[in-house]
Amino acid sequence: MATLTEPSSSLSFTSSHFSYGSIGSNHFSSSSASNPEVVSLTKLSSNLEQLLSNSDCDYSDAEIIVDGVPVGVHRCILAARSKFFQDLFKKEKKISKTEKPKYQLREMLPYGAVAHEAFLYFLSYIYTGRLKPFPLEVSTCVDPVCSHDCCRPAIDFVVQLMYASSVLQVPELVSSFQRRLCNFVEKTLVENVLPILMVAFNCKLTQLLDQCIERVARSDLYRFCIEKEVPPEVAEKIKQLRLISPQDEETSPKISEKLLERIGKILKALDSDDVELVKLLLTESDITLDQANGLHYSVVYSDPKVVAEILALDMGDVNYRNSRGYTVLHFAAMRREPSIIISLIDKGANASEFTSDGRSAVNILRRLTNPKDYHTKTAKGRESSKARLCIDILEREIRKNPMVLDTPMCSISMPEDLQMRLLYLEKRVGLAQLFFPTEAKVAMDIGNVEGTSEFTGLSPPSSGLTGNLSQVDLNETPHMQTQRLLTRMVALMKTVETGRRFFPYGSEVLDKYMAEYIDDDILDDFHFEKGSTHERRLKRMRYRELKDDVQKAYSKDKESKIARSCLSASSSPSSSSIRDDLHNTT
């Protein structure tokens, strides 16, 4: 299987490098760069690109409407590069010469959807023969700790490109994106495999489909969710594979067929929006709504009004965890429907609870949301981004109750995501100790950090904040290790939240610099003597800028404290008497 950084020479006559969604720039060997043929082809590619990117070169003779936006294209180029377009344009015999023909992209796609950015990326390859870097605003998420190599926006972007490449018949792109998706399957969360499975099924990508089916079959994904999400024949294959290779009974307890049948009836009643039937089935049977995972199922698949009616029955626990360690709010976060989030919070759902791998509902939402949806400013009278609304609602709820952080469930292993989040928090708190020692100590005392053990990573020691295997307790089981690390993470999150609430200016400085220094061991004396002369000079310059910002933040926090002191002084007896005198004179 190809890796994400594998060059694909078949994709580009200019030897473009096709790496992960950051996805690098073009690389040329010295011998290729001096080859006149390669130079000519590179020049041709750049010139053709101008037809797409330069508004002064708008000589298009047709338009393709994508997400309501017309994209100018040149039929001769599309026909030469794609058999689909060649056949499409052959059928057009009577076209008015006074106006450009218009085509709806959604009418070309029998399945799937391709957004505007994905189609422009596809067109760029059609015109230039080169694969450019993925646009970060739609191929990354807004979780600052994520490496973006297998988050949902990264997967969704490649899935869209696969639909476009398959339906519009560009086989070399199909081959390349199939390798990319195969790599995602083993790295991402199992729920993120489902859109990959669907594109593999629709585009008849047998190898990719088999890999997806195998991954889902060996997971603990809920049987009824699988039946809801995938075609019946695929669901049956997954069921048969699970029978052949039974799952671990500790993580997936055995459920009788009779019980499954009763649960199925309850969930079908939810599918039909028949709340009265749901109530009747629950009343007449010995199964509770929690045992059927009814609330989890409803917040994902039911209409928001139906969800509100189900919650009004008060027959389920909104903080109940399913066998995978997800609460109802975690599932609602995947749905990204603000009204459902609010309904759950009104019923007492805890926004600060974690999954077994250390993610809260906000973390889940951020991993699902791309920067375009999160940062785009909505014009007056236009609909806001639902994902952004959900994130704002949950973050406000956490800020209202910053100290309500329950210890999360513990899994038998420590996922990579938990390690990344811990390293981020350790670096942030460590940086706060360097520049705001007094404030950091107060926040750490509130968070009870001293009562937990520092996380320094599990990899062999190399530099900075990496791990030391000699310090590992060999008597500690994986379950104990995960519990210890989750406790540490809760303490660090309490510390950060306390800092945000009571020392806002210092927190703003940390926010600004954490993004820049997240991949550097800044806490190790800033490593001033590492790197080239130019790099060391830049580090010193950035250090001086950081010192200035720290001093400003310290002054602002100090001014805030003085202002609060003055405010409290204004309520003293003497000031009260002055106010009374003024009142009496009036």
Swiss-Prot record:
Annotated InterPro entries: Ankyrin_rpt (IPR002110), Ankyrin_rpt-contain_sf (IPR036770), BTB/POZ_dom (IPR000210), NPR (IPR044292), NPR1/NIM1-like_C (IPR021094), NPR_central_dom (IPR024228), SKP1/BTB/POZ_sf (IPR011333)
Annotated stretches, region: Disordered: 554-586
Binding site for salicylate: 428
Gene3D superfamilies, A to Z: Ankyrin repeat-containing domain, Potassium Channel Kv1.1, Chain A
Record field: compositional bias (Low complexity): 565-577
GO BP field: defense response to bacterium; defense response to fungus; plant-type hypersensitive response; protein ubiquitination; regulation of jasmonic acid mediated signaling pathway; regulation of salicylic acid mediated signaling pathway; regulation of systemic acquired resistance; response to salicylic acid
Binding-site residues for Zn(2+), renumbered to this chain: 141, 146, 148, 151
Region of interest: Salicylic acid-binding core (SBC): 383-523
ANK repeat residue intervals: 261-291, 293-320, 324-353
Pfam families: Ank_2, BTB, DUF3420, NPR1_like_C
Zinc-finger ranges (C2HC NPR-type): 138-152
Disruption phenotype: Elevated PR-1 expression level and enhanced resistance to Hyaloperonospora parasitica. The double mutant npr3 npr4 accumulates NPR1 proteins (while NPR1 transcripts level is normal) due to reduced NPR1 degradation by the proteasome; this leads to a reduced growth of the compatible pathogenic bacteria Pseudomonas syringae pv. maculicola ES4326 after inoculation, but impaired hypersensitive response (HR) and subsequent systemic acquired resistance (SAR) induction when infected by the avirulent strain Psm ES4326/avrRpt2.
BTB domain location: 60-135
Keywords, comma-separated and alphabetical: ANK repeat, Hypersensitive response, Metal-binding, Nucleus, Phosphoprotein, Plant defense, Repeat, Ubl conjugation pathway, Zinc, Zinc-finger
Subcellular location(s) of the protein: Nucleus
A GO molecular function held by the record: identical protein binding
Recorded GO CC terms: nucleus
Record pathway: Protein modification; protein ubiquitination
Induction of its expression: Up-regulated following pathogen challenge or salicylic acid (SA) treatment.
Highest taxon of the lineage: Eukaryota
Positions bearing Phosphoserine: 10
Known partners and oligomeric status: Forms homodimers and heterodimers with NPR4 in the presence of salicylic acid (SA). Interacts with TGA2, TGA3, TGA5 and TGA6. Interacts with CUL3A, a core component of the cullin-RING ubiquitin ligases (CRL). Interacts with TGA2 in vivo in the nucleus. Binds to NPR1; this interaction is promoted by association with SA, probably due to conformational changes.
Purpose of the protein: Salicylic acid (SA)-binding substrate-specific adapter of an E3 ubiquitin-protein ligase complex (CUL3-RBX1-BTB) which mediates the ubiquitination and subsequent proteasomal degradation of NPR1 in response to SA. Together with NPR4, acts as receptor of salicylic acid to monitor immunity in a NPR1-dependent manner and induce systemic acquired resistance (SAR). Involved in the regulation of basal defense responses against pathogens, and may be implicated in the cross-talk between the SA- and JA-dependent signaling pathways.
Domain comment in the entry: The BTB/POZ domain mediates the interaction with some component of ubiquitin ligase complexes.
Family: Belongs to the plant 'ANKYRIN-BTB/POZ' family. 'NPR1-like' subfamily.
Protein name: Regulatory protein NPR3
Organism of provenance: Arabidopsis thaliana
